[in-house]
Swiss-Prot record:
GTP binds at residues 17-24, 81-85, 135-138. This is Elongation factor G. It comes from the Bacteria. GO terms for cellular component: cytoplasm. The lineage of its organism: Bacteria, Bacillati, Mycoplasmatota, Mollicutes, Acholeplasmatales. Coiled coil: none annotated. Keywords: Cytoplasm, Elongation factor, GTP-binding, Nucleotide-binding, Protein biosynthesis. One of its GO terms (biological process) is ribosome disassembly.
Amino acid sequence: MPRKFPLEKTRNIGIMAHIDAGKTTTTERILFHTGKIHKIGETHDGDSQMDWMKQEQERGITITSAATTAFWKEHRINIIDTPGHVDFTVEVSRSLRVLDGAVAVIDAKAGVEPQTETVWRQATEYKVPRIIFVNKMDKIGASFDYAVKTLYQRLGINASPIQLPIGSENEFKGIVDLLEMTGVEFLGTSDEKFKTIEIPEYMKELAQNKRIELIEKMANYDEELMMDYLNGKEITVEKLKNVIRQATLKADFFPVLCGSAFKNKGVKKILDAIIDYLPSPMDVSSIVGCNFENKEIIRKTSDNEPFTALAFKVMTDPYVGKLTFFRVYAGTIKTGSYVTNATKQVKERLGRLLQMHANSREEIKEVYAGDIVAAVGLKNTTTGDTLTSINDDIILESMNFPEPVIEIAIEPKTKADQDKIGIALSKLSEEDPTFKIYTNRETGQTIIAGMGELHLEIILDRLKTEFKVEANVNQPQVAYRETLTKISTTEGKFIRQSGGRGQYGHVIIRFEPNSDKGNEFINKIVGGVIPKEYIPAVKKGLEESLSNGILAGFPLIDVKATLIDGSYHDVDSSEIAFKIAASMALKQTKNEGNLVILEPIMEVEIITPNDYIGNVIGDLTSRRGKLENQDSRENTVIIKALVPLSEMFGYATILRSNTQGRASFIMQFLKYERAPKNIAEEIIKKRN
């Protein structure tokens, strides 16, 4: 069946912003004006079309990227609505990976906000072309000039208005189009009716100056336009629009629009700008992957190429089960076809193909290059996997997600909850690559880890509402370790005589540090002073004792144990006696005074605006942090530091507070390091 919409008339876009900048409302209005919905939902009323998860409607924020398809002026627009809260940046990241363009929504009063900076960096990393919509022009305190100024100051980008607002706050009533040099006055209707007017007299000079600024910027991108401008020729609307498009497609220039989505002012102009300036799949570079021999393979965006797609999201749907969202980069595929999951090397069947609208769906028979769809039936596919035609051998670059930075211990409230909690947690972690589950071997606790307190709060909420699982949460333990600092030779002798056969085991073992090489056992017994059948028992006794620790019950690591001597008894010696003797020898090292507590050290990378460097560094120092590196980029600084894990609990909240939410951080385990004496004494005291 031929495709309904040619590739050049397809747009895959995301809508991104800081929390509360109005991006879900903007998406709602786009869907309303494109005829996709018949009643406008309001985020603050909890009935927004795109925010379909119960937790989203309660909080009025977007958590998962809802995908939907809309139509405007014979173009198909696939839209992903992304979250604005810092704990859900992974949703933004994976959406940007599969999109061709984006609309960045900023608040006319607040300008560029913290999460705008974070999301902007992610979009820049993926080289996503963007247009900017200055929203809430009707808000008290709205200032278009201020909002545009923050684009330069906080993002350091090359942007220019292509519209100007007529009035602001309660007086906001229209816009000036700097390309057409005409005015538009909104009539205040929900379908955004407007009339074309002349530019108000008091704005004519400003509009003329802003148009000249725009043309001068565009002259840098097109020699013909530059010559026409220098020669005093009239720059046509068509020519200017074409050059703005080329500059925007390079992700080197960002057109700025304005309006009020809530008041239905300027939304249709966003739709026009999406078509005019954002790329179709054909404008985007060919997709590059590797085959199994690591040779580069290039796929063009064409229906005639072999089927190639990237899975970017997994969701559990209450009606159809597991839904896998994927972006088709090349080729076509029909419902019921088999595909290869090239990443995992397994064959999968596409049970059903669905075009999604928030949480409702439309079944389709075939998908084409450039499409974003959801599939039912992909059992083994997870986020970042490549899907190809059978026997094809291309793997696309997967997605990298930050490690979780906050964790809590969790336990089921009842026996019934215990049976369900494992399945529920594994389903949730399948959906979200930044949500991790593991068991703490020392404490036996189940630990859940995520990107922030709100992230884990939502997980616990979903456990309760979707999976009907009640759970208690505790504070997690830090996984400390113990080790030796110098060589010591100790003796372990276990003799027990209580009538009948006794017990006898005797060993002499040399213990020494084995830096970063793990625990090691070496047998140096010669001449049969300990029969070889008892050697495994000595090793086993040491392994068990090492895992239980000596100072505070934490596992001993990086210890080399060499069995050098001992003795045995013909009748009384046994495996158990030698196990106990080995354990006694290890415990003797405590008397040598060479055991220490090790603490996990995290490598922490913080990205903060220049204004907050002092706050951030001061706080890190108070957490026993060691600064490793400081690197300035545009208006931000990247600080690298080594900090003990025990000092990092609650850090996300403190960092937000210290930087007004404008900094972000990632951390990962680096090494174990000797804990300072006072810290070690405190740990031992607590454990004993």
